[in-house]
């Protein structure tokens, strides 16, 4: 049902998505995109292989990568939001930075794994159609992971350990 709902959404075109506010609004958008990409990848794989999907180890591995990244991204977001609620945005700056960094890396992993699944499960016109759907689902502004990573590193070096 979730895959069918996603495919209906994809075929109907862009919709007015729920806009979140706060320091992690962009990361919530990335999480939603990662979920959609994962459902799309699962749909592509199940459509192609049906009952034989369990025999496609590389496809199953790529799907597992997507699922793990979605789970970890959501866990990271929820933990950061909990810290923001408890300590305030300023005191949770390190958690916000780490969440931004991880979300940027995770969406790239999900997108790459989805491409791998599409390449293994489709060909010809269907392949091109599914790639265009992937591009639409994976629209996001890339984060400056270099600056964010340096900010995290400075904080860790100053404290002599990870601080959260």
Language-model segment annotations:
Residues 1-164:
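Flavin-dependent oxidoreductase catalytic core characteristic
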């Amino acid at each position: 049902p979730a895959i069918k709902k996603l495919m209906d959404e994809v075929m109907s075109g862009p919709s007015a998505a729920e806009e979140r506010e706060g320091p992690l609004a962009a990361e919530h958008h990335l999480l939603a995109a990662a979920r959609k990409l994962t459902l799309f990848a699962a749909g592509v794989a199940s459509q192609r292989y049906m009952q034989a999907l369990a025999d496609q180890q590389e496809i199953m591995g790529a799907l597992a990568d997507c699922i793990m990244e979605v789970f970890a991204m959501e866990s990271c977001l929820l933990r950061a939001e909990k810290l923001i609620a408890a300590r305030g945005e300023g005191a949770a700056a390190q958690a916000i930075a780490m969440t931004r960094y991880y979300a940027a890396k995770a969406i790239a992993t999900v997108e790459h794994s989805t491409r791998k699944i599409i390449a293994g499960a489709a060909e010809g016109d269907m392949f091109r159609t599914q790639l265009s759907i992937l591009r639409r689902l994976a629209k996001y502004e890339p984060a400056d992971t270099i600056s964010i990573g340096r900010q995290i590193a400075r904080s860790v070096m100053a404290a002599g350990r990870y601080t959260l």
